[in-house]
A protein has these predicted regions:
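Structural motif
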Residues: 19-23, 60-65, 106-112, 155-165, ...
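Short loop/turn segments that connect beta-strands within the blades of beta-propeller domains
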Residues: 10, 18-20, 28, 49, ...
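A short beta-strand motif characteristic of beta-propeller blades
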Residues: 1, 30-36, 71-79, 120-127, ...
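Short loop/turn segments that connect beta-strands within beta-propeller blades
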Residues: 26-30, 67-70, 115-119, 168-172, ...
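Repeated scaffold domains used in trafficking and secretory/extracellular systems
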Residues: 2-9, 37-48, 81-90, 129-141, ...
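Blade-level signature of beta-propeller repeat domains, shared across WD40, Kelch, NHL, RCC1
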Residues: 189-226
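Recurrent small/Gly-Pro-centered beta-turn motifs in extracellular repeat architectures
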Residues: 18, 57, 99-102, 148-152, ...
Length: 226
């Protein structure tokens, strides 16, 4: 099997992203389909409990695919600004998809929330906050708590303080912000990028640092608050 930028599998399928093409395989490694609906498709994620994947393009597009029927469910263009490599994930129950986006400029971020029946955006959050920059997010599968990694700019627009916060999905606000060191932030930013790839060797080669310590946002958040 070819070397992919990202690779994922569940109980039924395997998915590999080359950038140009999304390859679908069965569990035995037999190729079932190749999708080329969105360019620069480097990362993907399985919806919990279903054979549906979200594919994210660094060009600012999303694609949602049903692997049982091997078809594109929906294609969304958020922006044509490049370098869209921030974090994304499904909620633990699969009812929502969360995507960190940069629709206006590479210096501004927002959090897009999509319901997963029709993959329609239901909320755009933090778009007016010019000081807070979002980078990665993760859910605790047991508690449903969402942790968000980011940083705050100072009055000059320069990165000032790095943080992990609880994102309250009901009130759609950041709560209980814990500030972390620049070293912790830099490691987590790169580690989470590698994690989004499914920990592939090809992506690791471009991380240019040792990622020997397995860390979650939850672990660092709890340690910062102790």
């Amino acid at each position: 099997m070819r070397r992919f930028w990202s690779f994922y599998q569940n109980e039924s399928y395997q998915v590999g992203c080359s950038g140009k093409t999304v390859y679908i395989y069965d569990k035995a490694g037999n190729e079932l389909a190749k999708f080329r609906d969105i360019p620069y498709a480097y990362t993907a994620a399985f919806m919990p409990g279903k054979n549906i994947i979200a594919v994210k393009s660094t060009e600012g597009r999303l694609g949602f695919y049903d692997l049982d029927s091997l078809c594109l469910l929906k294609r969304i263009t958020i922006t044509r600004i490049g370098a869209q490599d921030e974090g994304f994930c499904f909620s633990p129950d699969g009812s929502f998809f969360y995507n960190i986006e940069k629709p206006i400029t590479s210096l501004r971020t927002q959090l897009g929330v999509y319901e997963t029946n029709t993959f329609t955006k239901v909320s755009t959050l933090f778009a007016e906050d010019v000081r807070t920059v979002l980078r990665h997010l993760e859910f605790d599968e047991k508690t449903g708590t969402c942790y968000l990694l980011g940083y705050v700019r100072n009055d000059m627009g320069v990165r000032d303080r790095d943080f992990i916060a609880i994102f309250n999905t009901e009130s759609q606000t950041l709560q209980d912000i814990h500030f972390i060191s620049q070293k912790q932030y830099d490691y987590l930013e790169i580690y989470k990028h590698w994690e989004l790839s499914g920990f592939t060797e090809k992506t690791l080669e471009w991380c240019f640092c040792d990622l020997d310590e397995k860390l979650s946002l939850k672990e660092v958040y709890e340690a910062a608050g102790s």
